[in-house]
Amino acid sequence: VVKVVEVEVEKPQTYSEAPGLAQAVSAGSLPPVGERLPSDPMVMPVFGSIGKYGGTLRRGYLGPQDGCNMFRVSRTSLVRFAADGFNLIPSVAKSLTPNSDGSVWTAKLRKGMKWSDGSPFTADDFMFQYEDVIMNDELTPSKPPFLKLGDGLGEVVKIDETTVEFRFPGQNFLFAEIAAQADEACYGNTRNVPWAPAHYMKQFLPKYNSDVDALAEAGGFEDWTQLYL
């Protein structure tokens, strides 16, 4: 079983931010950085020295098929691979633990996480993605790998605002590794992650918006499914 290990790094007492964000804070259009972060933010270990804002980022590409290369620096997943390429470390989830037979995995989310518009990021965003998007065959006829187990399919259950369980019909000790690769960075596949911003995306579903077809037509789409995707 691949273990999700805690990263032993010192929690900063103060935080820095990009100059453009600092200007927005000074202008009063953005809260201070400390108020935008969760109570236990993820802190990555430093390799060499702490970087500086600005400059040029150069990436090495493996060839024409390496189109997702540029997105790897911005990917976000439930857990992520450590620098050794083997161990898994926390990310969106501060912990991800299985039961004794690997059929149930419990994800503890970081308290106080927010979406880019400042709205809370909670277990409700997982439930929206699972119930209204992934289990909607019009939007997701082929289910994402992180929820599959052979011919069966797992389910997502909210325990509380910061706790989610992934329940499978059998042993699934590879779930953590698969979850570490489930992100939407490459080509915007928003159904390949366990969450979605429910507060924003609900407006594009007929379940929550009776005028969604008119919204799709106004945007030049054939129907609401194209608008959503």
Role assignments for model-derived ranges:
Residues 2-8, 58, 104-108, 155-157, ...:
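Ser/Thr- (and often Asn-) enriched beta-sheet segments in non-cytosolic proteins
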Residues 23-26, 31-101, 131:
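N-terminal lobe/hinge region of extracytoplasmic solute-binding protein
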Residues 33-34, 140-145:
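Surface-exposed patches in mature extracellular/periplasmic domains of secreted proteins
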Residues 145-229:
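Surface-exposed binding/hinge segments that line
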